[in-house]
Amino acid sequence: MGLIQHKREAYWFYRFLSLGYDRWVNPLFWTPEMRAQALQEARLDDAGLTVVDVGAGTGFTTAGIVARIDAANVTMLDQSPHQLARSRAKPELERCARVLGDAETLPFDTDSFDRYVSAGSIEYWPDPERGVAEAYRVTKPGGTALLIGPVRPANRVARALARAWMLFPPAHEYERWFTAAGFADVKLTKLAPRWYRNEHVPYAIAVSGTKPRPGPSPAQLPPRADPPAGPLRFAARFVLGSAAGAAFVPIAAVLSLRARRGRRR
């Protein structure tokens, strides 16, 4: 489990990351082109659909959703009040509902939403299988769930940093989790920013599936287990995990500059 892959550690990580999330993180790691490609798999084909965006953060993914769906039908959920507060500065999200909550214990009734979307959130979940089972539970029968997350890097240095930071599963794990949760027609879509050049290992995955019948997920899950750490362990996790995560920014920035120079030649 990654050092920031815990509820309290992730809460404080985003307390600080929210200050520059839209300026530094999205342009490098979760671009408008990636968002558009991923949201195609959510089947946002009717403005009247009800949609929940789990791990909505500052609303970057939500902005892509409300370009197709009436904002009054969209619910943004996040455990970080600081991220959600930043989303209020975006006028297109003014009519969205905002809920503080846990992706692994969603505060919604079973069969509540036509569409479930979650982008860049699963990597912080201590129990990703439980989170996917919750995605199944709150989606209406016949509805679609879409989850976007990172993939284990091919580069050894990046892989070591990723392992220290948070959850970076191999692509096939996403498919396994969706299938085990009960979703049908499970599909994987590879995503990458323009600077990413590895054709053999995807940068990120969008996994989608359809809920075939009403009710909760048939997945058999063990009891929840993410006991809070003591002060020293928490501090060590937070500092070391944040440092590992911060290292990705200059790496991505350098690769992005190289890619831009290559396109100009």
Roles of regions detected by a PLM:
Residues M1-D45, F60-G64, Q83-R86, A154, ...:
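Conserved class I S-adenosyl-L-methionine
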Residues R194-L232, R264-R265:
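Core SAM-dependent methyltransferase catalytic element
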